[in-house]
């Protein structure tokens, strides 16, 4: 259900502009493209928390609320929900600002999901989070 009367939750971790090459056959931005932006944004926060490499291990309940158009500004907001021994659970929201299509200036939440990342060592094996690295 769309997030009405709500402001973005978390820190802005990624901001980009949609392009025509990111569209599906209907002319809307691909859901997969939006999901990849969320993954990149979430990984940025997870890497900061882990103090090093992380991998995405799970995406829970991604919900797309509204279509995204060419020329829209896409902002990914993230906040850490919890940490485990090596895992970092992050809530991600995608907020859109319409600057090319109508209604101009509209700001809304287009998608939300929970991403889980795991801190890994140089061999790609899970490693414990350092106590000082946990936010």
Curated annotation (Swiss-Prot):
Show which residues constitute the signal peptide. Answer: none
Q: Which NCBIfam families match?
A: PRK10694.1
Q: Name one Pfam family in it.
A: 4HBT
Known PANTHER family for this protein?
ACYL COENZYME A THIOESTER HYDROLASE, ACYL-COA THIOESTER HYDROLASE YCIA
Keywords recorded for this protein, A-Z:
Hydrolase
According to its UniProt record, the EC number is: 3.1.2.-
Q: What is this protein called?
A: Uncharacterized acyl-CoA thioester hydrolase BUsg_263
- Reading the lineage from the top rank, the first entry is Bacteria
Q: Which organism is it from?
A: Buchnera aphidicola subsp. Schizaphis graminum (strain Sg)
Top-level EC class: hydrolase
Q: Which GO terms describe its molecular function?
A: long-chain fatty acyl-CoA hydrolase activity
What are the HotDog ACOT-type domain coordinates in residue numbering? Answer: 8-123
* InterPro entries listed in its UniProt record: Cytosol_ACT, HOTDOG_ACOT, HotDog_dom_sf, Thioestr_dom
SUPFAM superfamilies found in the cross-reference section:
Thioesterase/thiol ester dehydrase-isomerase (SSF54637)
Q: What is stated as this protein's family in its record?
A: Belongs to the acyl coenzyme A hydrolase family.
A GO BP entry is: acyl-CoA metabolic process
* GO CC annotation terms, alphabetical: cytosol
